[in-house]
């Protein structure tokens, strides 16, 4: 209850400043299938361009309390910021250890029809790296375990700049449709993880086609 109240407080007080500063434009792969309203349990995945991606998601899906997987480094900045992230429902992922309790926490949330937000790249890309970075398998494992649909999102990662923030929401994916009984669990996890990454890449390509088409129409 506290997280839900705090999340709504942040969204209500932050909506206008965020809208003015970032001017987020939302596109849809198929709005009839998936809009900004999420019904039931779901896992949201996205490419990772900026530390502000987390804030953008709060306002992209305002009607749900998103429980975001966040790297341990963000919780170690200072106690106040750590409290802020936890109050918003942030789940700490310690990438330096072999503690996978975050997967169980995500599963428990999904079992209660909650929404989990994951950045499968697990870190921001460095200059010159091909994006999106390789995905970690925890998303695929959590989706298989919970049978929750995966909603892919692509963002151009532009915040507080002259260039407008733009987002493309894809259609949900049922990862069990990719499960191959002839493969081992490890092979299935690897295959599904790669296909989830391919799905985000397809969104990125579609986004770029739409942007190029607009530029050509202006020319």
Model-derived features: where do they sit?
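Compositionally biased, charge-rich terminal segments
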Residues: 1-5, 69-72
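Short, glycine/polar-rich helix-capping loops at beta-to-alpha or helix-loop-helix junctions
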Residues: 10, 76-81, 160-162
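Non-catalytic C-terminal accessory region of glycerolipid acyltransferases
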Residues: 2-5, 103-219
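Catalytic core of membrane glycerolipid acyltransferases/transacylases, capturing the structured
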Residues: 36-97
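Glycine-rich, highly charged phosphate/nucleotide-binding loops
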Residues: 23-27, 97-102
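Helix-to-loop junction immediately C-terminal to a conserved catalytic motif
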Residues: 14-48
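Short hydrophobic helices that act as membrane-entry/anchoring signals
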Residues: 3-22, 82, 86-89
């Amino acid at each position: 209850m506290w997280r839900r109240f705090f999340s709504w407080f942040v969204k209500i007080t932050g909506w206008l400043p965020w809208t003015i500063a970032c001017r987020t434009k939302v596109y849809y792969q198929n709005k009839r299938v998936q809009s900004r309203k999420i019904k039931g349990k779901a896992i949201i995945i996205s490419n990772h361009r900026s530390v502000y991606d987390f804030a953008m998601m709060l306002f992209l899906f305002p009607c749900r309390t998103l429980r975001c997987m966040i790297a341990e480094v963000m919780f170690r900045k200072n106690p106040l910021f750590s409290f802020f992230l936890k109050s918003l429902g942030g789940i700490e992922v310690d990438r330096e250890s072999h503690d996978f309790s975050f997967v169980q926490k995500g599963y428990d949330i999904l079992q209660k029809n909650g929404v989990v937000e994951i950045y499968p790249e697990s870190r921001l890309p460095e200059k010159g790296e091909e994006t999106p970075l390789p995905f970690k398998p925890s998303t695929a494992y959590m989706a298989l375990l919970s049978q929750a649909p995966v909603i892919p999102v692509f963002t151009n990662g532009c915040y507080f700049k002259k260039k407008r923030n733009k987002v493309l929401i894809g259609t949900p994916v049922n990862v069990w449709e990719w499960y191959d009984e002839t493969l081992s669990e490890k092979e299935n996890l690897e295959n599904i993880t790669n296909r989830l990454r391919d799905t985000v890449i397809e969104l990125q390509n579609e986004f770029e086609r739409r942007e190029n088409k607009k530029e050509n129409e202006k020319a």
